[in-house]
From Swiss-Prot:
This is Small ribosomal subunit protein uS5. The gene is rpsE. Keywords: Ribonucleoprotein, Ribosomal protein, RNA-binding, rRNA-binding. GO terms for molecular function: rRNA binding; structural constituent of ribosome. Residues 1-36 are annotated as: Disordered. Residues 49-112 form the S5 DRBM domain. PANTHER family: MITOCHONDRIAL RIBOSOMAL PROTEIN S5. It comes from the Bacteria. Part of the 30S ribosomal subunit. Contacts proteins S4 and S8. GO terms for biological process: translation.
Length: 203
């Protein structure tokens, strides 16, 4: 009996060896795993810019349900190196209105000319609507003779010595536009010489 049991066990073991082992398919974890999305830090172009809130006022909009109260903010930004911009934002909350105004100002950046001493090249007169702004060069050490929205524009643009005079309407938005229009009228000595077909020494 013992011999028969041994033979059966030997036969069974031989059958097991002859049978091909069933192996589970190898799963490549690297292939199945989806690549992680890369996170990029968006660099803001206005990191070196300064903001100045010129005016905040409360506005209302009449709807079927009644009056909807909101706030509007007028902001001027600049890098004090010849780049300046302005924008307006509206929202239910004042901070949100200021953020929208800054975002709008980023899309309205302009480059203005200035001398090495921080003044303008010559007299200019800017106008927008009924607002008029006169800008005059000033000697070094004079400072900024301006007030209100005009001062915000010339300071953030980087001017250090300048005379200004605002006349006509005093709406902040129109005054800012008039100031920028005046600054854009500047001509450098090289540009004036080119227009007159003369050299710098002949001017």
């Amino acid at each position: 009996m013992e011999n028969n049991v041994k033979k059966e066990t030997i036969v069974d073991s031989e059958k097991v060896e002859k049978q091909q082992p069933v192996t589970a398919p190898v799963v490549n974890k690297k292939e199945n795993t989806q690549p992680k999305a890369k996170t990029f830090k968006r660099e803001t172009t206005t990191s070196n810019f300064e903001e100045r809130v010129v005016k905040i006022k409360r506005i209302s909009k009449t709807t079927k349900g009644g009056r909807m109260m909101r706030f509007s903010a007028l902001v001027v930004i600049g890098d004090k190196n010849g780049t300046v911009g302005f924008g307006m934002g509206k929202s239910i909350e004042v901070p949100d209105a200021i953020k929208k105004a800054i975002k709008n100002a980023n899309n309205n950046l302009i480059k203005v000319k200035q001398t090495k001493k921080g003044s303008i090249y010559h007299d200019v007169n800017g106008r927008h609507g009924a607002a008029k702004v006169m800008l005059l060069p000033a000697p070094e050490g004079t400072g900024i003779i301006a007030g209100g929205p005009v001062r915000a524009v010339v300071e953030l643009a980087g001017f250090t010595d300048i005379y200004t005079k605002s006349r006509g309407a005093n709406a902040p938005m129109n005054v800012i536009r008039a100031t920028i229009n005046g600054l854009l009228q500047q001509l450098t000595p090289q540009e004036i010489a080119r227009l007159r077909d003369k050299s710098l020494k002949e001017l």
